[in-house]
A protein has these predicted regions:
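Generic recognition of flexible, low-complexity loop/linker segments
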Residues: 11-13, 154, 217-221, 317-319, ...
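Switch/coupling segment of Walker-type NTPase motor domains
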Residues: 14-16, 360-448
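Glycine-rich phosphate-binding loop of nucleotide-binding enzymes
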Residues: 1, 315-396
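Residues in well-ordered beta-strands of folded domains
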Residues: 26-28, 167-169, 233, 319-322, ...
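Extended, folded cores of ATP/NTP-driven motor/assembly subunits in large transport
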Residues: 1-302
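Short, intrinsically disordered, charge-balanced linker/junction segments flanking boundaries
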Residues: 1, 448-449
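Core mixed alpha/beta domains of very large multi-subunit molecular machines
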Residues: 282-328, 336
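Short, solvent-exposed loop/turn segments at the edges of secondary structure
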Residues: 18-20, 225-227, 324, 340-342, ...
Length: 449
């Protein structure tokens, strides 16, 4: 399933490949003197971002040099035949950018795509890289709905099955300049709305009102104008049929939610470099602006375009249970990282719904991690599991209850035995004091006999 996809019925083609969604934040700021104050300002900004994400229950971790070359190397050196990520050896005496690229790496630039070639273990691999960027601002966008662009819950066929990188590059524009621009725009539109121009173009009144509200938010510091570039980079095998399927999957998935994407003919190399960390600050974002592919919107609207997926992988091991968006996830209720204070679990379902099919893998994961399991089975549903795992299956029909087992002092244990017999004698309610007293006398008499 991880290599291709889950088996499906005849005539059904759903992209049910396993996923491992990750979000990486990179930030670069111009600095002429490279002073300690600039570094301290950036460190404080990173702390604010991490604290904000932690407030939304999104855990983060800092990327060190080893993690950096592993992440960027995985983004650059894509091998469609590789199933596991490759860990690279960090050389502290060499620049990081040279350590991210394989020695056998070659890249061919085409008009409509890029071709990436590698050679590993005596075998050549070729991958095709496709890029698509946002043609215009969407009419409406919600942060909770962004994941439907690449893994739709209600329409699973509108999903992206190939590996991809979704990049959102943004720059907050100067507040004073944007405020002045909004003032000029508002004054011009308001002037036109009071003339005969408004009779020919009725929308000018609405535009004047919107620019008036925007300048108020900019003046009070409640909002900012952001220039952003949204791009998706997809990797697939180097053949035309597969590339066409990937292209249609991406365009249709985003179009479903009102996002119009286009393929940057003759500019795939530019878009591919955009997904790499810190490249936008090296003059690439200026090239994007000159090409006219950068969009503008308020900071609130751009924040709703962030590529976040609310699917948690839960635990590093346990029962494999992918989410609805095919995120690779595991269930282990005893994992300490989940901070569980109650390890009880209830499973409900009709007959034949698969309750036993869920619990059996959980039992296997507990046994594989060194634990033990005790099952009270009514219906022999766990008999084969017990035999396969080398356990001991006890038939309840041959068992007998001895309430006096392991008792050495009847004076200390008589009331406990009395309580056990009370439950057996009256399972639907408590006995009164008279009957409990008679049972206690019977327990002592039986022990002495």
């Amino acid at each position: 399933a991880a290599a291709t996809q889950f088996p499906l019925p005849e005539g059904m083609n759903l992209p049910l490949t396993l996923r491992h969604y990750r979000v990486f934040f990179s930030y670069c700021s111009p600095s002429k003197k490279k002073s300690r104050a600039d570094i301290l300002e950036m460190e404080n900004l990173v702390k604010i971002i991490r604290a904000s994400l932690q407030g939304a229950s999104i855990t983060t971790q800092a990327v060190d040099a080893q993690a950096f070359i592993d992440i960027v190397g995985e983004m650059i050196n894509h091998n469609p035949d590789s199933l596991y990520p490759k860990r690279r050896q960090l050389d502290p005496y060499s620049d990081l950018n040279y350590q991210c690229v394989e020695d056998s790496f070659d890249l061919k630039v085409r008009a409509d795509y890029l071709t990436l070639g590698l050679r590993e273990k005596g075998r050549n691999s070729t991958a095709r890289i496709l890029n698509f960027h946002l043609a215009r601002n969407p009419e409406i966008a919600f942060l909770w709905n962004m994941a439907d662009n690449y893994s739709n819950l209600l329409n699973p066929e509108l999903s992206i099955s190939c590996p991809f990188i979704l990049t959102l590059t943004l720059v907050v524009e100067d507040q004073v300049k944007t405020h002045s621009e909004a003032n000029l725009k508002y004054m011009d539109l308001e002037k036109k709305s009071k003339t005969s121009y408004a009779k020919w173009f009725p929308s000018v009144e609405k535009e004047a009102k919107e620019w008036g509200e925007l300048r108020q938010r900019l003046g009070s510091g409640q909002s900012s104008v952001v220039s952003y570039f949204l791009n998706i980079t997809a990797f697939c095998k180097d053949n035309n049929e597969t590339a066409l399927e990937v292209e249609q999957d991406i365009l249709n998935s985003f179009r479903k939610n009102g996002f119009e994407l286009i393929s940057p003919r003759f500019n795939h190399m530019r878009n591919f470099l955009t997904c790499l960390p810190f490249m936008a600050g090296k003059g690439l974002f200026k090239q994007l602006k000159e090409a006219g592919v950068v969009q503008r919107a308020e900071s609130f609207n751009v924040a709703n375009l962030m590529p976040l997926v609310a699917d948690n992988p839960l635990t590093p091991a346990g029962l494999l249970a992918p989410t609805y968006r095919n995120q690779l996830a595991f269930i282990d209720i005893f994992f300490r990282g989940m901070n569980n204070t109650n390890y009880n679990m209830a499973v409900c379902g009709t007959s034949g719904a698969g309750k036993t099919g869920l619990i059996q893998p959980l039992i296997r994961s507990v046994l594989d991690s060194g634990g033990f399991a005790v099952v009270f089975d009514m219906g022999d549903g766990y008999k084969s599991l017990c035999e396969n795992m080398g356990g001991v299956y006890l038939d309840g029909e041959t068992l007998r209850f001895n309430p006096f087992a392991n008792i050495t002092d009847i004076d200390q244990s008589a009331e406990r035995v009395r309580d056990q017999l009370s439950v057996m004698a009256s399972p639907n309610g408590n006995l009164d004091e008279v009957h409990e007293g008679l049972l206690l006398q019977a327990v002592r008499a039986s022990w002495l006999a």
